[in-house]
């Protein structure tokens, strides 16, 4: 049995060429990874299937539950092939986007094989090329072309990405490739599906119709239009990822920190986990130590109340994947122990509508704190009871006992929660007995310690959080 209780916030790490071997995956997990991410923008299905098998073997070896997150590529918009493969755009130059894959007749004609863009763009709209390095503004639009003026100059080359801030495209959030990858991931048994480039709440409805309850659904927030519908998107999702890379291209960079705080708050109100992602320790792709700004960025996300922070290239292709996880874990631990951490967390606690389940969860945190209990034990089928207690951010571990293997794995994203597979209980007394035993078996409490036990009645009913008891461990 492996139990990690040295910190509350979680770590997500991306698997790639630098980290796909069984030995490195084991080292990453022991260094602090709680959930592994399979990025389907890169690598083959065989690569991802092999990583999946290695993680599940590690899970069995250590007697623990490890979450696996499948990140779908999404509908990436790209220009086509240029006349000479490369084009230098100068400020105020006029260019023409041509609908199709082939270059137009003129040297300044840029193929754009996405007819939905020509239907959506209006004069005055901006188009960003190559992650925002080049910016052009639409002057005139037809079904076959967009005439534009260069606002920010720079070079472009074949198949560079295009972003359209503020423009909602009439496209599915799932490409044909995504749909095949999705079915592949669900057949493997991934625990989370992350949906890229979510534009509206409708995108989540479409994805849910395919995923159902076979995995948790994560909305990646990287479009301004998603920010406009964030409450509905959170309601339709099981978790949120603050994907700051593309989001920082489509909105001004100075707006990203505030938006990050807003998204974390929205998820905390809804009692759903939120992951802060992108370039958190990016310099560690090539360096054994992070910059001080990167350390502050990780700490800032923890002070904001994020459930998890994520590594991308750092663990997938970097030279120091294990060291990166170790440093990230130490930053989280140090931040959570700082004298300002609790006051900041409590000062930013959102006001939640008073319902019996919320009242019981909040009371559990308050009672545990007053009694100096070492752990709160929660019985949960769907994970909802544990998530409600997690929302209260108690300064002690939450031991979630669940009969569901999927729930145990998914709780690897939830702040402060340690999950343990446990048989379904039939009576209230059985639940208390099991809680007291598990608290000691996991090392989270000692015999005779007072612990707080939270259950729901009727038993094995998802979402019923209505009972609290103080008892002795042992």
From Swiss-Prot:
ATP binds at residues 39-42, 78, 160. SUPFAM superfamilies: Phosphoenolpyruvate/pyruvate domain, PK beta-barrel domain-like, PK C-terminal domain-like. Pathway: Carbohydrate degradation; glycolysis; pyruvate from D-glyceraldehyde 3-phosphate: step 5/5. It catalyses: pyruvate + ATP = phosphoenolpyruvate + ADP + H(+). The keyword Nucleus does not apply. Gene3D superfamilies: Phosphoenolpyruvate-binding domains, PK beta-barrel domain-like, Pyruvate kinase, C-terminal domain. Mg(2+) binds at residues 222, 246. It holds the Pfam family PK. Its cofactor is Mg(2+); K(+). Keywords: ATP-binding, Glycolysis, Kinase, Magnesium, Metal-binding, Nucleotide-binding, Plasmid, Potassium, Pyruvate, Transferase. PROSITE patterns: PYRUVATE_KINASE. The record marks 220 as: Transition state stabilizer. Induction: By tartrate. Its EC number is 2.7.1.40. It comes from the Bacteria. K(+) binds at residues 39, 41, 71. One of its GO terms (molecular function) is potassium ion binding. Substrate binds at residues 37, 245-246, 278. Belongs to the pyruvate kinase family. Homotetramer. NCBIfam families: PRK05826.1, PRK06354.1, pyruv_kin. This is Pyruvate kinase. It comes from Agrobacterium vitis (Rhizobium vitis).
């Amino acid at each position: 049995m492996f139990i990690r209780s040295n910190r509350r916030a979680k770590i997500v790490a991306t698997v790639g060429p630098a980290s796909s071997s069984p030995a490195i995956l084991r080292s990453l997990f022991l260094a602090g990874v709680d959930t592994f991410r399979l990025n389907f923008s890169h690598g083959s299905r065989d690569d991802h299937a092999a990583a999946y098998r290695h993680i599940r073997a590690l899970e069995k070896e250590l007697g623990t539950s490890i979450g696996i997150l499948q990140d779908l590529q999404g509908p990436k918009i790209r220009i086509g092939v240029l006349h000479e493969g490369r084009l230098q755009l100068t400020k105020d130059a006029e260019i023409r986007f041509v609908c199709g894959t082939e270059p137009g007749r003129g040297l300044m004609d840029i193929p754009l094989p996405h007819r939905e863009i020509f239907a959506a763009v209006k004069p005055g709209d901006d188009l960003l090329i190559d992650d925002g390095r080049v910016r052009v503004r639409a002057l005139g639009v037809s079904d076959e072309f967009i005439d534009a003026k260069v606002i920010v100059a720079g070079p472009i080359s074949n198949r560079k990405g295009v972003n359209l801030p503020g423009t909602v495209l009439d496209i599915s959030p799932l490409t044909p490739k995504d749909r095949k990858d999705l079915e592949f991931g669900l057949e493997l048994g991934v625990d989370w599906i992350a949906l890229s480039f979510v534009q509206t709440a409708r995108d989540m409805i479409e994805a849910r119709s395919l995923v159902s309850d076979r995995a948790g659904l994560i909305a990646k927030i990287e479009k301004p239009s998603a920010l406009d519908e964030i409450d509905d998107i959170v309601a339709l999702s099981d978790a949120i990822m603050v994907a700051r890379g593309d989001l920082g291209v489509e909105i001004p960079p100075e707006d990203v920190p505030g938006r990050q705080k807003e998204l974390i708050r929205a998820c905390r109100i809804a009692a759903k986990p939120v992951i802060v992602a992108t370039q958190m320790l990016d310099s560690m792709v090539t360096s054994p130590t992070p910059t001080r700004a990167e350390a502050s960025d990780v700490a800032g996300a923890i002070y904001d109340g994020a459930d998890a922070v994520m590594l991308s290239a750092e663990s997938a292709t970097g030279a120091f994947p294990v060291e990166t996880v170790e440093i990230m874990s130490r930053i989280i631990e140090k931040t959570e122990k700082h004298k300002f951490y609790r006051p900041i967390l409590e000062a930013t606690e959102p006001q939640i509508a008073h319902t019996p389940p919320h009242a019981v969860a909040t009371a559990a945190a308050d009672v545990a704190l007053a009694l100096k209990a070492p752990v709160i034990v929660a019985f949960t089928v769907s994970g909802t009871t544990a998530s409600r207690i997690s929302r209260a951010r108690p300064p002690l571990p939450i031991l979630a006992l669940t009969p569901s293997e999927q729930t145990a794995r998914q709780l690897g994203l939830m702040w402060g929660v340690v999950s343990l597979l446990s048989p379904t209980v039939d009576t209230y007394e059985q639940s208390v007995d099991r809680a007291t035993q598990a608290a000691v078996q996991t090392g989270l409490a000692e015999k005779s310690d007072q612990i707080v036990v939270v259950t729901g009645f009727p038993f094995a009913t998802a979402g019923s959080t209505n009972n609290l008891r103080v008892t002795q461990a042992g």
